Design a protein with these regions (language model features):
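Active-site-facing substrate-recognition patch
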Residues: 1-51
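Short glycine-rich phosphate-binding loop at a beta-alpha junction
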Residues: 51-61
Length: 171
C-alpha cells in the first residue's frame, strides 16, 4: 500500500465520515510535502496544454501547493488564481481578479465530494468572464459516490478495488 493510502486509512480509523474527516484530511495533505509533489506530478499527466489555461487553487491547500511548487506552476499555466477556503462549509468564493487571462480553467484541490466548491467557484468565474468554465478538476481525495466526469483523483474512496481498506484494521 502506498503512503497516501496508509495516511488516509489512519484518518478513517479516527474519523470515519463527515466534516471531522475532511478537516483531518485537509490538515494532513497540506502538511505533507511528498504527497503535494506527487500530486503535482499526477496532475501534470492529466492536463492538456496547461499553458493555455487558468489554474484555480483554493484555501490553505492552494497556499501550500504554491509554497512548494509555485515556480513550476507559474511556468506551466497561463494564469493562477488563489481563492479563499471554507467554501465546502458555506463560505462564498472571493476572487480578487478582474480579468481572466484564459476562461479555460483547471482546478487543483485537496478533496472532492459533491462538486459544490467547484460549482460555486465556476459561477463566480462566469461573473468575470461569461465563457469561463472549469474543464478538469484534479484532486488528491475523491469521496463522491459516483464517478464524476472531468474529475481526476489520486485516491478514490468508492473505487471498484479499494485495496486501502485492508489497512482499516481496528485494534
Amino acid at each position: 500500500m502506498n503512503r497516501l493510502n496508509q495516511k488516509i486509512a489512519e484518518i478513517l480509523k479516527q474519523h470515519p465520515e463527515g466534516e471531522d474527516f475532511f478537516d483531518a484530511l485537509d490538515a494532513m495533505l497540506r502538511g505533507d510535502m511528498d504527497i503535494l509533489t506527487q500530486f503535482l506530478s499526477f496532475a501534470e499527466d492529466k492536463i492538456y496544454s496547461p499553458e493555455t489555461k487558468t489554474l484555480v487553487l483554493t484555501g490553505q491547500f492552494g497556499i501550500a501547493l504554491m509554497n512548494i511548487c509555485g515556480e513550476k506552476l507559474r511556468k506551466m499555466f497561463k494564469d493562477i488564481i488563489l481563492i479563499n477556503g471554507g467554501i465546502r462549509t458555506g463560505s462564498e468564493p472571493v476572487i480578487y481578479c478582474e480579468v481572466l487571462k484564459s476562461p479555460n480553467c483547471v482546478m487543483f484541490d485537496d478533496s472532492f465530494y459533491s462538486g459544490t466548491t467547484r460549482d460555486k467557484i465556476e459561477s463566480k468565474l462566469k461573473m468575470i468572464h461569461s465563457g469561463a468554465s472549469i474543464g478538469t478538476t484534479v484532486v488528491i481525495y475523491d469521496g463522491s459516490i459516483n464517478v464524476q466526469q472531468n474529475v481526476c483523483s489520486m485516491f478514490r474512496y468508492h473505487s471498484e478495488e479499494p485495496l486501502w481498506k485492508d489497512d482499516l484494521v481496528y485494534e
